[in-house]
Swiss-Prot record:
Pfam families associated with the record: SPOUT_MTase
Assembly with partners or alone: Homodimer.
Full protein name: Ribosomal RNA large subunit methyltransferase H
Chemical reaction(s) catalysed: pseudouridine(1915) in 23S rRNA + S-adenosyl-L-methionine = N(3)-methylpseudouridine(1915) in 23S rRNA + S-adenosyl-L-homocysteine + H(+)
InterPro entries attached to this UniProt entry: Alpha/beta_knot_MTases (IPR029028), RlmH-like (IPR003742), tRNA_m1G_MTases_N (IPR029026)
Keyword match Cytoplasm: yes
Class in the EC hierarchy, top level: transferase
HAMAP family, sorted: 23SrRNA_methyltr_H
Gene from which this protein is expressed: rlmH
């Protein structure tokens, strides 16, 4: 399933942001909150050259072994990331401030990348091949978070970093 938040194709000087998540997010308050932040990000992003393209949900692998599940899901994530900056949400990733994350997004945009792929792994995490291919790996802290909350937190951080880069007062230091 792919939920689109922007109806335009990426134009010159814009970078597309797309989220690929292993697993489905069921209807409920978490999905509503994530959609609310993603909609805000989609509306605010074009002013600073960022377009939120949408969210793709990748079915969880049904393979028997953990290793094979991670590999199968990882191959799909890597296929989607071709030609773009790949940012993983991973418990082993860097713990960046919102400003630091905004700076990284601006750097990808200004370096000529046309797409940023945000990858959320399945219950078993990311395959080592995906970790090795990532341009950046970030964490929302040392704790383990439920998939639904990670999606909400990512949506809010995307909106927040867009407001930081645009000078909007939503974020306060």
């Amino acid at each position: 399933m792919f939920r689109r938040y922007a109806d335009t194709l990426t134009s010159e000087g814009f970078i597309r942001i797309v989220i690929h998540a292993v697993g489905r997010m069921k209807a409920g308050p978490e999905r509503e909150l994530a959609d609310r932040y993603l909609d805000r990000a989609a509306k605010a992003g074009p002013a600073i050259g960022m377009e939120l393209a949408g969210v793709s949900e990748i079915p969880e692998s049904r393979a028997r072994s953990t290793l094979e599940r991670k590999r199968e899901e990882g191959r799909k994530l890597l296929d989607f990331a071709q030609g773009g900056a790949l940012i993983l949400l991973d418990e082993r990733g860097k713990n960046l401030s919102s400003r630091e994350l905004g700076d990284r997004f601006a750097s990808f945009r200004d370096s000529g990348f046309r797409q940023i792929v945000m990858a959320i792994g399945g219950p078993d995490g990311h395959d080592d091949a995906v970790r090795a291919a990532a341009d950046l790996s970030i964490s929302f802290g040392a704790q383990t978070w439920p998939h639904q909350l990670v999606r909400v937190m990512l949506a809010e951080q995307l909106y927040r970093l867009i407001t930081i880069l645009s000078g909007h007062p939503y974020h306060r230091d």
